[in-house]
Curated annotation (Swiss-Prot):
Name of the gene: MT-CYB
Sequence positions that bind a ubiquinone: H201
Binding site for heme b b562: H83, H182
Protein name in the entry: Cytochrome b
CDD domains (UniProt xref): cytochrome_b_C, Cytochrome_b_N
Amino acid sequence: MTNIRKTHPLMKILNNALIDLPTPSNISSWWNFGSLLGLCLIIQILTGLFLAMHYTPDTLTAFSSVAHICRDVNYGWLIRYLHANGASMFFICLYIHIGRGLYYGSHTSQETWNIGVLLLLMVMATAFMGYVLPWGQMSFWGATVITNLLSAIPYIGTTLVEWVWGGFSIDKATLTRFFALHFILPFIITALVTVHLLFLHETGSNNPTGIPSNMEKIPFHPYYTIKDILGALLLVSVLLTLTLFAPDLLGDPDNYTPANPLNTPTHIKPEWYFLFAYAILRSIPNKLGGVLALLLSILILIFIPMLQTAKQRSMMFRPLSQLLFWILLTDLLTLTWIGGQPVEHPYIIMGQLASILYFLLILVLMPIASLIENKLLKW
């Protein structure tokens, strides 16, 4: 009798994706983050669903409904902090996943890469709207600053901002639509993840060497299921440690003050995972220029396959590209730090230099390094 997992229409799809999937035998722990992102998405959807059962998207009661969740709902505090810190874990995994893709040349699988960039944008949009929902000071002012960026668009800017707000300022209409969008986007993300995996399984996984490994592939189960379970246990351990011992470590104290349109916080800043882009936005004195730089700082990922000039797929055997990759990483960490600092003397110029270096590395230096390495191959 043929095994049901190989014949049943639904089981067959799962079998080909999770059990009998031919996988390179040498992929390292950097390949764990795809499955960890799936786990993060499941955690976020489940905790978010329970939070939505008690949350009220109204300017008068939103803040107190979050307080009610933490104080009166059974384990409400745990669900709330798992959701908030789960977002941080999501972005840590996301950035490592993208970094691994850049380092090992995963962007040569163009459809998978482009859907990945689209997923990144959607996760960022979801996280931004989620940050607005508790209706604290930073929620309100963060939403005001970011939505106001649309007004930099010539001619239609002001109309567009009012259309997003649903009025002449951020109010109940804005909060309600942000809640609705924040609720539905994760399900759209889930659908896109399926497409992302579909395209990945068309070409098969890359591996650290960047060399096709069709000669020696191994089944996904049991080898990589065990490896992924270990990664999942570590992720859950870190998330629980963060949630139970330092739930507010990555948050902003200003968000424990109810939103007040008449009182501006001394330093408006987004969550830590957006600080690098925020630093790039602030480093340009012109409003439209800043918005374009902000967009380009993320959308630059779409152009990476076109900027690829190397004959070797992976950076494993390319020391010059490796050096530039690690400089890029330190530059991003510097931008993240600067994004959290006030706009004053040393930080302004540092932010501008770090922003220039960011674009210079990706658009100019890395393609040139690849060309030099191509020349060295012929020696």
